[in-house]
Amino acid sequence: MVLLLLIAIGIVLLIGWRLPLMGSEWSKQTIYVGLLDAWHGGSTDDKAYAMWIDDDSTEGVFEVKAIADEVGIKPAFAVIADRMEPAVADSIASWQKQGAGIVLHGLRHERWKDWDESQIENDINLSYARLHEQGFDTTKILKLIIPPHGCNTRIIRRVIARQGCQMISGASLVNPDRHVFQFGRIGIGPDTDLDAMRQMLQKAYDRKAFVIFSTHSSIPEIFSAEKIRDVLRMTKEIGFCFEPYQ
């Protein structure tokens, strides 16, 4: 019992400051990725970086682009390659030419959890092909992959690593820097506590950490344009660099 208590205290000390709200996101995946990051050590980046990724690529992307333009940053879109309406695909492809980031999020958003390596690889390859058909520059797609539904298995990680990409996991964490394999991301929604967010961001900035913000404009009830603007402006005010991810 004492050993378990010491382990729990150790986990809190190692990754507690990197959670969006203390005690609210202690999922198994968050703890797992957080401990891996702790092993990685401190930041090797020259400054603190931030990035905003919106998932699922539906009509909500137009509001995302408007917010990004208003705040003065380049957004990134986690696209479901074969589920975009033509107007959405055409718009995101044109925004890519203006500097928006494109992240793979599956061909049809099917769960990879129970798939074998060949099935996952095929899904990734078909995603690239489908995006190329829709006018995307596949040579400039970010080397980041978000497995659909937050799936995270050894097989998925192995395939993504073999693709020469980094993985954005379902962990809700600030990242130590831009060089770890598995990234966490911080959700922004209607219930986001701005004071708690500012405290976390200040600590992240002081440590030259890398923050990925996550939204789902495809789900209006958990999408808050007001909170997103507030958080992004706050992040810029603190001093984070939104330089496009390479």
Q: What would you call each of these model-derived segments?
A:
Residues 48-49, 69-166, 170-184, 208-220:
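Metal-dependent polysaccharide deacetylase catalytic core of the NodB/CE4 family, i.e.
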Residues 12-14, 20:
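Hydrophobic alpha-helical segments of integral membrane proteins
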Residues 16, 25, 38, 51, ...:
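Residues in intrinsically disordered, low-complexity segments of regulatory proteins
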Residues 1-12:
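N-terminal Sec-pathway targeting helices
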Residues 2-4, 38-40, 89-91, 200:
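Short, well-ordered helical secondary-structure segments
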Residues 64-66, 88-90, 115-117, 196-198, ...:
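Surface-exposed beta-strand edges and their flanking turn/coil or helix-capping segments
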Residues 67-73, 231-234:
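A short, Lys/Arg-enriched amphipathic alpha-helix followed by its capping loop at the start of a domain
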Residues 20-53, 57-63, 134-137, 151-246:
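C-terminal active-site subregion of NodB/CE4 polysaccharide deacetylases
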